[in-house]
Amino acid sequence: MKAVTVRTGDVEAPRESRALPVVLILDRLRSAYNVGNVFRVAEAARVAEIAACGYTACPPHEKLEKTARGCDKLVLCRHFETAADAVAEYRSRGYVIYGVETVEGAQWYWNAEIRFPCALILGNEALGVSEEALSLCDGFISLPTFGCKNSINVGNCAAVVVFECLKRTLV
């Protein structure tokens, strides 16, 4: 059997060299551990930046740092009072705004028409994306769920949608 080399270390690479034209707007996430998970996803896919809104943990934060494993130092993060404030900022910079939520009219992520640059709004673990933020979206993306629960962990959801965006920018 042929030997396989597994990359075990981190690599130095300038962030600005190949940033994915995606911003993640975190709307009132209550778990700093989930926020750290989103930072790991964002760094792996080279997401342009993260907008932490409301009471969402923002670096530096001890619990966030535990799951971010250093990615909080590699991904730009800005704090906004509300998701609506973040939407206004990114829309003024030409971003198309998508709510990642199980709402009527949402397109499953693999069929969704996604225009870049885009901002993806990810909502609170129990409450979802706020009504105010939903009202400001240009479109909606969802992950189908066939079990009893109508959602998956926000960090896992971020991974699925962000890597779908990455795939589309690479093809």
List where the protein language model places each region.
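Post-transcriptional modification and biogenesis factors for structured RNAs
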Residues: 1-171
